[in-house]
Amino acid sequence: KPSHMVMPAIHLNRKQCAKFFSDELKEDIPSDIPYMIQTARRVLREEFLKADMGITGANFGIAENGAIGLVTNEGNARIVTTIPPVHVIIIGYEKLIPKISDAAKIMRLLPRNGTGQRMVSYLTLIDGPTPIIHEKEGKLVEENKKVYVILLDNGRLKAAHDDKLKEVYQCVRCSSCLNVCPIWSTVGGHVYGYIYSGG
């Protein structure tokens, strides 16, 4: 179970990670970090290539043009959005912003506050289906991907108009609150018993 929104395995040391890999993959994985990274890359890419559907969230959605933005350091989100023929995006109403110019602020804020970076390794903007070129009966054919966007309410719209809760809409889930929280640094994220851990 993740303990941190941006760094979900921060509570594990390399030996615990190796045990997790070994248990999941049913093979002996050494606690060598570069080896584990290569193993994760190999296994995940095999799964991505076989997938009929990729499901992602989004760091923001732009009302002006309907685009969504994904901000990552690993590149997995880009693979999930491009290889499978169907892409499903699940995004909460609180992540919708008016204009593309507003996205620039979030793109500066997230890496700085989340991981102390100037910019992330991968920034992906998606504003509709992209063509997929593949071989069919000896010929290269072009087909459009299918992209579905699910807007998640779950009380979000009501919270936006509540004087006590509307401040929650300012959260971009960078986790900087966790990084400076003395309680979180003492007890960790698991004691909160929910997806979002204190802070």
What do these predicted regions represent?
Residues 38, 97, 165-171, 175:
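Conserved structured core elements
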Residues 136-168, 178-179, 184-199:
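Ferredoxin-type iron-sulfur electron-transfer modules in oxidoreductases and energy-metabolism complexes
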